[in-house]
Regions:
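C-terminal capping alpha-helices of c-type cytochrome domains
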Residues: 83-97, 110-136, 225-241, 249-279
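Electrostatic cytochrome c docking/interface patches
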Residues: 14-30, 147-175
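Extracellular/periplasm-exposed beta-strand and loop segments of Gram-negative cell-envelope proteins
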Residues: 135-141, 157-159
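Gly/Gly-Pro-rich "capping" loops immediately C-terminal to redox-active cysteine motifs
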Residues: 42-84, 103-115, 141-149, 186-226, ...
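The canonical Cys-X-X-Cys-His
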Residues: 25, 32-42, 87, 122, ...
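Extended amphipathic alpha-helical interaction segments
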Residues: 156-157, 181, 188-191
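Soluble non-cytosolic domains of exported or imported proteins
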Residues: 19, 29, 81-82, 113-117, ...
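Bacterial N-terminal signal peptides
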Residues: 2-13
Length: 294
């Protein structure tokens, strides 16, 4: 009787997730990590939900033109023929099954930090979505050669404890939601000031410039209340009531759980105050563009 009892006690001691792996993957891919934001084609009235994750969107940047791939289970035009490990390698290491490197705008340098549990959940979700047959003939183009890799092979990655709000918030703002990717300007690949904003984005809406999300009280969000920060993230409405601009995916962020939002805000509160960096001469960026913050 001793062994079965020990086994039962061990099972009871294990953390239990209230949602299934696929449900957790759906939350990540559709809400906080917003894979759907890039990988779902758009029409004049918004995302084409019958082609969710079917790819084909073109992302234009001053250094590249990226054609977004189909990541549905379609075996011919998607990733249906890939193994789970191959999909995980594509997400965390930016490496396709044929060995070629996935370039920007895929944020592989952030996804390297995704926990084993979270990346498995995303794979389970991608296996479960309807297959979309969407042949994509256009190719991505990069003005600069891609590196040989985005880093060494990723080993085991543990998730930070959820009861450490700042550490877990840093995980959400980094590898999961990639807040710091947009809200940190980089010059020659170096992060000038984490969270200080100033990065320009060009789209159908015009030009938007990422906001300073550090604890600086004049240039950042240091004097905002938690409710004001949450409203900005969930609804795209700034403290003064003006509407924020894309590419921040406010519609998806409405579904962020209360616990995750608390952790995100705790992390943002912990960022040292920084002033938004000035653009490089000739960069063409417009950090001071009125009404174009996000």
């Amino acid at each position: 009787m001793g062994r079965p009892l020990v086994g039962i006690l061990l099972l009871l001691a294990m953390p239990v997730r209230s949602e299934t792996l696929v449900e957790h993957g759906r939350y990540l891919a559709e809400t906080i990590a917003v894979c759907t934001n890039c990988h779902t084609p758009r029409g004049p009235n918004g995302p084409l939900l019958d082609k969710k994750l079917g790819g084909g969107e073109v992302i234009k940047h001053q250094d590249f033109t990226a054609v977004v791939p189909n990541i549905t289970p379609d075996r011919e035009t998607g990733i249906g023929a890939w193994t789970d490990n191959e999909i995980m390698s594509a997400i965390r290491e930016g490496r396709r099954p044929d060995g070629s490197l996935i370039g920007p705008a895929m944020p592989s340098r952030f996804y390297r930090g995704l926990s084993d549990e979270d990346v498995r959940a995303i794979v389970a979700y991608l296996r479960a979505v309807p297959a979309v047959h969407n042949p994509i003939t256009a190719k991505s183009h990069y003005d600069r050669p891609l590196p040989a890799s985005w880093g060494p092979p990723v080993g085991q990655v543990a998730e930070p404890p959820k009861d450490d709000k700042i550490a877990y918030g840093a995980y959400l703002a980094g590898p999961v939601a990639r807040c710091m990717d947009c809200h940190t300007e980089q010059h020659n690949g170096l992060e000038a000031a984490l969270g200080a904003g100033g990065k320009a984005f060009y789209g159908p809406w015009g030009v938007s410039v990422s906001a300073n999300v550090t604890s600086d009280e004049s240039d950042g969000i240091g004097d905002w209340s938690d409710a004001e920060i949450e409203r900005a993230i969930r609804t795209g409405v700034a403290r003064d009531g003006h509407k924020l601009f894309p590419p921040m995916p406010f519609t998806a962020y409405t579904g962020i759980t209360a616990d995750d939002m608390t952790a995100l805000i705790a992390y943002l509160r912990s960022l040292p105050p920084r002033v938004e960096p000035a653009p490089l001469s000739g960069s063409g960026q417009a950090p001071g563009a009125a009404g174009s913050r996000h």
